């Protein structure tokens, strides 16, 4: 079994020119697979059948592997067995048609209205706080991705008509409205922006005058959340998810939210309908006299 694996590593390294990191990941997964096979007294790849592949997955799950890691292990095994088929050592790939356990759908976390109010209730006049408040207000008001906000220039924003021009995924441009609170916060920021000695046309700059980095935004939001007494970790995703959830709760217009978020597929936006249903179910449970549903 090891001889075939060594030929496979050479194939990946020389012919496929895969990175050492990727090869190491494959090695880790297949080494673990061989250990499971050895426990079943399987010492030849020709002994591996579809039932054996399913056993490998079941045993790996029993050992504590999560869904994502199980999918990686199956993928590594399937690719290797496909190589053996190409080499004529196997007639068919026994892993073909076998799926790893589906990854559970993790609903994004969001803040409720009171938490948003708590987050933004800060009127500090420090220039860096004025900048951060503008970032927070704009992200929550428009649902921008972190990369979209970080890439904004001065000419991207129009506080008079309250619109921001965004370059999203796939280099697609869209225009997103924002509210009067965000507009006011941005105007306040523009009054003090020159104090940071900006070196380019970036809307949001660091204290060194450069375009603020992704990491700096993440750290500032985390710090702001702690300072405002939020119990949960604050990050750009949470602001975007909160925007989407609150928009759906207020309007139920999935297509409009899709456009605002810049999703190319409606299915991506539909995850927020699950969040919205959770909110409605909670209201129902609290309000209806016969609503005590079993959980």
From Swiss-Prot:
Keyword Cytoplasm set for record: yes
GO molecular function, one term: tyrosine-based site-specific recombinase activity
Catalytic center residues: 145, 169, 237, 240, 263, 272 (o-(3'-phospho-dna)-tyrosine intermediate)
Ranges where the Core-binding (CB) domain occurs: 1-85
GO BP terms in the entry: cell division; chromosome segregation; DNA recombination; DNA transposition; resolution of DNA recombination intermediates
GO cellular component, one term: cytoplasm
Keyword Cell division attached: yes
Location in or out of the cell: Cytoplasm
Domain Tyr recombinase intervals: 106-285
Record's keyword terms, sorted: Cell cycle, Cell division, Chromosome partition, Cytoplasm, DNA integration, DNA recombination, DNA-binding
Subunit details: Forms a cyclic heterotetrameric complex composed of two molecules of XerC and two molecules of XerD.
Similarity-based family: Belongs to the 'phage' integrase family. XerC subfamily.
Function: Site-specific tyrosine recombinase, which acts by catalyzing the cutting and rejoining of the recombining DNA molecules. The XerC-XerD complex is essential to convert dimers of the bacterial chromosome into monomers to permit their segregation at cell division. It also contributes to the segregational stability of plasmids.
Name of the protein in its database record: Tyrosine recombinase XerC
The organism of origin for this protein: Haemophilus influenzae (strain ATCC 51907 / DSM 11121 / KW20 / Rd)
Upper lineage: Bacteria, Pseudomonadati, Pseudomonadota, Gammaproteobacteria, Pasteurellales
């Amino acid at each position: 079994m090891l001889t075939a694996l060594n030929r496979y590593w050479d194939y990946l390294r020389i012919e496929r020119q895969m990175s050492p990191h990727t090869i190491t990941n494959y090695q880790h997964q297949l080494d673990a697979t061989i250990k499971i096979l050895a426990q079943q007294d399987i010492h030849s790849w020709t002994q591996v059948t579809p039932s054996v592949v399913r056993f490998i997955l079941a045993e790996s799950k029993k050992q504590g592997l999560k869904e994502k890691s199980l999918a990686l292990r199956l993928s590594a095994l399937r690719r290797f067995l496909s190589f053996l088929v190409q080499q004529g050592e196997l007639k068919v790939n026994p892993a073909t048609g076998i799926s790893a356990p589906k990854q559970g759908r993790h609903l994004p976390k969001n803040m409720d209205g009171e938490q948003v109010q708590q987050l933004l209730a800060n009127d500090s006049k420090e220039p860096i706080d004025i900048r951060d408040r503008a970032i927070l207000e704009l992200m929550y008001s428009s649902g921008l991705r972190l990369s979209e906000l970080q890439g904004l220039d001065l000419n991207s924003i129009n506080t008079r008509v309250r619109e921001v021009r965004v370059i999203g995924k796939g280099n697609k441009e869209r225009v997103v409205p924002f509210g009067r609170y965000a507009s006011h916060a941005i105007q306040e920021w523009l009054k003090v922006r020159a104090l940071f000695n900006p070196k380019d046309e970036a809307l949001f700059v660091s204290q060194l005058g450069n375009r603020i980095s992704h990491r700096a935004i993440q750290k500032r939001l985390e710090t702001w959340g702690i300072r405002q007494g939020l119990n949960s970790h604050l990050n750009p995703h949470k602001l975007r998810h909160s925007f989407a959830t609150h928009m759906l709760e207020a309007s139920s217009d999935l297509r409009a939210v899709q456009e605002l978020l810049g999703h190319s597929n409606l299915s991506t936006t539909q995850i927020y309908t699950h969040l919205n249903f959770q909110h409605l179910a909670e209201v129902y449970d609290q309000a209806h006299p016969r609503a005590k549903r079993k959980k």
